C-alpha cells in the first residue's frame, strides 16, 4: 500500500483524484491540502464522498508531503515546480496535473504561461505522461507532467498515423476542432462560467491562440520524430453547455501512401492491447456520454473523400483527460497493474 498526497483537493481534478483513489486497492490518500478550506471535512464540501472518507483538508505542509510515496498537484500552473525538487530529494514521486512539466521548450512555457520556470533542471528530467505512448519512460520517472485534456485526444487520435513507417498524412494541414464541457475551466467562480452565460450557448474561445497549442505541437513532433513539420496546424477549442466530456474532430489530408493504407486496420492494430483506448467500427460516432466517469477514450474514423480523413476522439475531460490518466501513470510508476482502480464503466444515461 502506497501513501498519497493531493495538493489542491477542492478543484474538480483534485476531487476526481480522490474519488478514484478511494477505490484503489493499493493506494491510500493521507494528505489532502487546500489553501482555503483547511480543517474542513472533505465530505462537507463533496457530499458524494460522505461515508467513504473521513479526511479533512489541511494546509500545505512540505514535511507531511515528503512522507508520501507520491504527490499529485491538482493546482494552478506554477505551484508544482516550487516544490518538486524538495519532494524528489526526499524520495517522493511527483505527478503534476498543471502545465509545469508538460513543455520542454522553456521559451514556449514562459510565453504561454507568463512565468519563468522555477526548476528547469527538474523539468529536463521529467517525463511527459501520455501513458499509451510513453509507457516505459513513465515506469522510471520521478516527475510526471500529466498531459492537457485537449492534447490527449489529439495525440491518441493521430499517433497511429504519425508512428507509421510511411508518411500517411500532410502534417502541415491538420485542423483540430475540439469541444469541452465547462468543468475543463476549473471550479473557480468566473462570469463566463455561470449557468446563465453557458446554458443554451455554444462558443469558441482561444481562437487567436490557446495554451494547449504549443503542447500539441511539441508532443506531435516527439511522436513523429520530426521537428518543424506542424507549423500549419490549426487548433480551435469550443465550450459546450455540459459539465463533463470532450470531443475532438481532427481533419487531415492523406498522402498517396495514406490513400492506399487500410486505416481502420492500422488503428485497430495500433491500439489492440490498450485497455483505455477503444477503436470503434468505421463511420461510428463516439459520444461523450459513453465515457462519462470512465478512464477511456473512444476513436472513430471517417474517410469522406479519397484524400481526406476525419478522426473523432471522445473522452471525459476530468478522467482520461486529467485525473484518471494521472492515476494510470501512478500505477506504472509503482509497478501496479495499469488499470488498478480504473475499471469503472461510463455512466449512461
Curated annotation (Swiss-Prot):
PANTHER family: N-ACETYL-GAMMA-GLUTAMYL-PHOSPHATE REDUCTASE, CHLOROPLASTIC-RELATED, N-ACETYL-GAMMA-GLUTAMYL-PHOSPHATE REDUCTASE, CHLOROPLASTIC-RELATED-RELATED. Its EC number is 1.2.1.38. It is found in: Cytoplasm. This is N-acetyl-gamma-glutamyl-phosphate reductase. HAMAP family: ArgC_type1. Catalyzes the NADPH-dependent reduction of N-acetyl-5-glutamyl phosphate to yield N-acetyl-L-glutamate 5-semialdehyde. It comes from the Bacteria. It comes from Acinetobacter baumannii (strain AYE). Pathway: Amino-acid biosynthesis; L-arginine biosynthesis; N(2)-acetyl-L-ornithine from L-glutamate: step 3/4. PROSITE patterns: ARGC (PS01224). It is an enzyme of class 1 (oxidoreductase). Gene3D superfamilies: Dihydrodipicolinate Reductase, domain 2, NAD(P)-binding Rossmann-like Domain. The active site is at 149. One of its GO terms (molecular function) is NADP+ binding. One of its GO terms (biological process) is L-arginine biosynthetic process. One of its GO terms (cellular component) is cytoplasm. Belongs to the NAGSA dehydrogenase family. Type 1 subfamily.
Amino acid at each position: 500500500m502506497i501513501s498519497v498526497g493531493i495538493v489542491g483537493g477542492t478543484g474538480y481534478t483534485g476531487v476526481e483524484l480522490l474519488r478514484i483513489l478511494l477505490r484503489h486497492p493499493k493506494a491510500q490518500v493521507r494528505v489532502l491540502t487546500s489553501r482555503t478550506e483547511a480543517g474542513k471535512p472533505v465530505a462537507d464540501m463533496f457530499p458524494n464522498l460522505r461515508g467513504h472518507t473521513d479526511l479533512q483538508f489541511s494546509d500545505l505542509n512540505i514535511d507531511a508531503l515528503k512522507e508520501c510515496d507520491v504527490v499529485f498537484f491538482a493546482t494552478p500552473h506554477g505551484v508544482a515546480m516550487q516544490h518538486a525538487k524538495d519532494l524528489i530529494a526526499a524520495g517522493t514521486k511527483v505527478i503534476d496535473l498543471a502545465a509545469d512539466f508538460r513543455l520542454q521548450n522553456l521559451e514556449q512555457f514562459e510565453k504561454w504561461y507568463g512565468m519563468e520556470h522555477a526548476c528547469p533542471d527538474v523539468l529536463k528530467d521529467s517525463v511527459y505522461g501520455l501513458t499509451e505512448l510513453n509507457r516505459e519512460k513513465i515506469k522510471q520517472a520521478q516527475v510526471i507532467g500529466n498531459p492537457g485534456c485537449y492534447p490527449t485526444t489529439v495525440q491518441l487520435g493521430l499517433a497511429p498515423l504519425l508512428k507509421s513507417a510511411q508518411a500517411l498524412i500532410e502534417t502541415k494541414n491538420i485542423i483540430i476542432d475540439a469541444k469541452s464541457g465547462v468543468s475543463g475551466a476549473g471550479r473557480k467562480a468566473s462570469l463566463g462560467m455561470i449557468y446563465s452565460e453557458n446554458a443554451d450557448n455554444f462558443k469558441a474561445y482561444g481562437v487567436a491562440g490557446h495554451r494547449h497549442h504549443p503542447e500539441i505541437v511539441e508532443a506531435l513532433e516527439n511522436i513523429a520524430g520530426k521537428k518543424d513539420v506542424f507549423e500549419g496546424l490549426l487548433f480551435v477549442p469550443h465550450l459546450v453547455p455540459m459539465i463533463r466530456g470532450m470531443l475532438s474532430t481532427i481533419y487531415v489530408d492523406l498522402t498517396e501512401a495514406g490513400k492506399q493504407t487500410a486505416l481502420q486496420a492500422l488503428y485497430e492494430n495500433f491500439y489492440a492491447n490498450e485497455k483505455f483506448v477503444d477503436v470503434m467500427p468505421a463511420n461510428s460516432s463516439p459520444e461523450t456520454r459513453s465515457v462519462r466517469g470512465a478512464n477511456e477514450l473512444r476513436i472513430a474514423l471517417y474517410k469522406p473523400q479519397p484524400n481526406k480523413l476525419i478522426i473523432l476522439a471522445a473522452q471525459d475531460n476530468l478522467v482520461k483527460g486529467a485525473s484518471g490518466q494521472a492515476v494510470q501513470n501512478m500505477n506504472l510508476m509503482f509497478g501496479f497493474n495499469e488499470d488498478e482502480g480504473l475499471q469503472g464503466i461510463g455512466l449512461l444515461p
